[in-house]
UniProtKB/Swiss-Prot annotation:
Its main location: plastid. This is Cytochrome b6-f complex subunit 6. The chain crosses the membrane at residues 4-24. HAMAP family: Cytb6_f_PetL. It comes from the Eukaryota. GO terms for cellular component: chloroplast thylakoid membrane; cytochrome b6f complex. GO terms for biological process: photosynthesis. Component of the cytochrome b6-f complex, which mediates electron transfer between photosystem II (PSII) and photosystem I (PSI), cyclic electron flow around PSI, and state transitions. PetL is important for photoautotrophic growth as well as for electron transfer efficiency and stability of the cytochrome b6-f complex. It comes from Psilotum nudum. Pfam families: PetL. It is found in: Plastid, Chloroplast thylakoid membrane.
Length: 31
């Protein structure tokens, strides 16, 4: 259970970081 929760947290962190990077690249393109 704990390993599944930590794996889900890691996956969520990777998804958020990818989304932030994507938004950051789009903002750089707009400038």
């Amino acid at each position: 259970m704990l390993t599944l929760l930590s794996y889900f947290g890691l996956l969520l962190a990777a998804l958020i970081s990818t989304l932030v990077l994507f938004i950051g690249l789009n903002k750089v393109k707009l400038i």
